[in-house]
């Protein structure tokens, strides 16, 4: 696998995995509409993404998920190996207007705040 790939093993898929991260993880947020739960001490790095239906139609929700996945994929080498995270996007101000750079800035700030980035 390449350095910037996004393998299937790194995706949270099962409901029990999502619930475990919600239950055991700690929430981090920069706004009411963008919350990340990070669970440290996991066996391997994994991510799950949930976008509320009230955010918009499927096109909008899927675009937001693609943006989050792309930021994760590009920053994957810089994230710690022992974290599981769940990104939850709720309706809010300017959520539909998100672009790659806004998502990147938000995620990096939250990852720094949570200590999810590897020490350089």
Curated annotation (Swiss-Prot):
Keyword tRNA processing set for record: yes
Subunit structure: Consists of a catalytic RNA component (M1 or rnpB) and a protein subunit.
Gene behind the chain: rnpA
Native species: Dictyoglomus thermophilum (strain ATCC 35947 / DSM 3960 / H-6-12)
Enzyme nomenclature, EC number: 3.1.26.5
Function of the protein: RNaseP catalyzes the removal of the 5'-leader sequence from pre-tRNA to produce the mature 5'-terminus. It can also cleave other RNA substrates such as 4.5S RNA. The protein component plays an auxiliary but essential role in vivo by binding to the 5'-leader sequence and broadening the substrate specificity of the ribozyme.
One GO process term, biological-process aspect: tRNA 5'-leader removal
GO CC annotation: ribonuclease P complex
Alphabetically ordered keywords of this record: Endonuclease, Hydrolase, Nuclease, RNA-binding, tRNA processing
Protein name per the record: Ribonuclease P protein component
InterPro entries in alphabetical order: Ribosomal_Su5_D2-typ_SF, Ribsml_uS5_D2-typ_fold_subgr, RNase_P, RNase_P_CS
NCBIfam families linked to this entry: rnpA
GO molecular function: 3'-tRNA processing endoribonuclease activity; ribonuclease P activity; tRNA binding
Enzymatic reactions: Endonucleolytic cleavage of RNA, removing 5'-extranucleotides from tRNA precursor
UniProt family annotation: Belongs to the RnpA family.
Gene3D superfamilies: 3.30.230.10
Superkingdom, natural source: Bacteria
Enzyme class, broadest EC rank: hydrolase
Keyword check for Isomerase: no
């Amino acid at each position: 696998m390449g350095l910037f790939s996004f393998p299937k093993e790194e995706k949270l898929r099962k409901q029990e995995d999502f619930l475990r991260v919600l239950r055991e993880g700690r929430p981090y947020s920069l706004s009411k509409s963008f919350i990340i739960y990070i669970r440290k001490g996991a066996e391997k790095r994994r991510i799950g993404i949930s976008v509320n239906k009230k955010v918009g139609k499927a096109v909008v929700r899927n675009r937001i998920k693609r943006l989050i996945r792309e930021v994760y994929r590009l920053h994957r080498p810089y994230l710690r190996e022992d974290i599981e995270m769940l990104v939850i996007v709720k309706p809010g101000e300017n959520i539909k207007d998100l672009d790659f750079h806004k998502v990147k800035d938000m995620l990096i700030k939250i990852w720094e705040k949570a200590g999810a980035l590897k020490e350089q």
